[in-house]
């Protein structure tokens, strides 16, 4: 799919230059040039997908939600949650239960580990956020109700949603169950990473590279251009700092979230304590009411972790059964005496156990705080990194800070090196940076742009703000896949493929109508239309008018009912169903309906047509009837007479008898044209030409047509020419067609007798075959007929226009011209002349119907009409 950027207007909007169907709209309802309340809305081809629905950790209540009023949630087709962190998932319950999302048909998807952890994490979130807060977003029951509606998916599972929307989840590292989503809408691929890590740690795999190239990459920019410390170095610094604080008799506070980096640090501390017996007397506490439940979830999804963890588990060594770590459900059971290590949630220390312990331990200089993850601006974790002398307690009191503060990042977010390498491997044409503060995002954009410019790559990088839609234009390349009978023989270059085009979920398939049921399960139907017309004229009069309008007719008798029938243009049947009634029948289609309408209009005007009145006028004889008295046998006799009359009418409708009145030929019928041509041919002086009356009439018509355009036309008689090499390439094409059509006419339809149709196009050869190359450079050399042709005489026309001239062999439809441009012009006019000369039945071919209401035929085409028996099963037998 070829992308292009829609230029932005001065007001920040998009100057739309193409159809809205081909535009991808990306709107951030959160995490646009900020960290927190991640919520990305994608709109393309009538589909709406929302990626993540988090809250902002620096705010509470409604203020923490994304800008949800900017979207009609009933139109959302799917909500995809990348992982269970609050800034990516905590607003989900509010959206599902308190917006019009429930009025739509959208569903929510996340991985199995994410759904399992999400329930426990959200229970803790509800408990903490609702404690002493009147601005509650939702309660426990609403959270559980929404949780039951979430659909869990596996990694690498291809999930299809009706309407051409599908997605696949890939490992993202970061935390247990975290994934990135590769979304495909009508062929457009979008990779939304969420939070991801390209470094394999003690228990998680690194983020995957999807096997297919996306058109758009939406990725995080949390750390901008910063570079992480090597893992072994920061692990050593982390354990050394903890050891140092313990040696000085202090307590270590590690603010973490219940799940995520906490498990990585627990594995590290348990391993370090095992290697240092002198620390066995110092307890490590994991302060969380959900700790035990969360650890059970980790043990359940061991198979999603890295090889190191799976290998230990296969040796019956469960890495999450810690030997030196104790769970602490609440501070009420905590004896705050002596050195210890306390891991407490939440990580931003806005409330909860971590905030309470911070306020309690901050005044003691022996204690130490180690911030191990990313801190959002506006939170206590971010503020205390500035090492203020005082901190503000939850109740507003000022608390002196004397404890040490260290920042050792174990954040499972990519740094610049990992992110830039990942972007290079993805190779997307558009990169959208999200989930990053404005300063970090701007630095990352500049650094990436410099890299792409140095390589000469035309990659577009975007940094949208919240509620400012980004519009990208994509030129969709629509292709249709041929299946079934059509695909049995691959077409050559330039061939026209004729079939049904099926569109489903933005995918196109072309197939033969006969294969429709097999490949789609759709049933087919044919609409046969019948129209009865009351008409008080003879059958011969009807035929006379139809011949004058449509030319050649196919006449016979209906095989089922024995009714004499006329078939017009191979598509519409006119039957004499009764003495004064006609039945018009046809298979419904756009072209056939048009022909049937014209036939019905013609039939309705026959009664009052002046030609009909003139031909049916005759002397009137008035008879006097003698009246007799009725006697009992008269009624029976009259009844017998009525039956006899009805029988006679029925026989007249069924028996193709000749008319008593000898109607003259219609002046515009094919028979009249041939007759007139024969008269003219007999009067012709050239004995070699007059024997073909039809060719003579065609030549006269073409001469008049050309004379009206060029003014100077000569009639010639030329002998048959010896065919040169290049003329031989074109003339046989006409001869082959004519012979094929002649074979059709000789074989015929068993139910019909038809006339030989005339070709409707001309075959041309160029002037370069008429003269040596040196003469071609001169303007309009004369054409020598004697030097070109010899043999039997036949009709020809010579056309002049200034210095240019051309000779037209009327019989073989070959054009010889002094220049290519003049030859093309004459060819076009000759084609028009032939079409105007040929009757409607011969000039227009109505193709066979597809036999399905899904495809009502096609428009008529200018072509030679084929034999009826090859196009549609006939019910007619030859008329005697």
From Swiss-Prot:
Keywords: Endonuclease, Hydrolase, Metal-binding, mRNA processing, Nuclease, Nucleus, Zinc. The keyword Nuclease applies. One of its GO terms (molecular function) is RNA binding. GO terms for cellular component: mRNA cleavage and polyadenylation specificity factor complex. The lineage of its organism: Eukaryota, Fungi, Dikarya, Basidiomycota, Ustilaginomycotina. Component of the cleavage factor I (CF I) involved in pre-mRNA 3'-end processing. CDD domains: CPSF3-like_MBL-fold. It is an enzyme of class 3 (hydrolase). Belongs to the metallo-beta-lactamase superfamily. RNA-metabolizing metallo-beta-lactamase-like family. CPSF2/YSH1 subfamily. Zn(2+) 2 binds at residues 87-88, 195, 435. Its EC number is 3.1.27.-. It is found in: Nucleus. It comes from Mycosarcoma maydis. This is Endoribonuclease YSH1. One of its GO terms (biological process) is mRNA 3'-end processing by stem-loop binding and cleavage. Residues 618-631 have a biased composition (Basic residues).
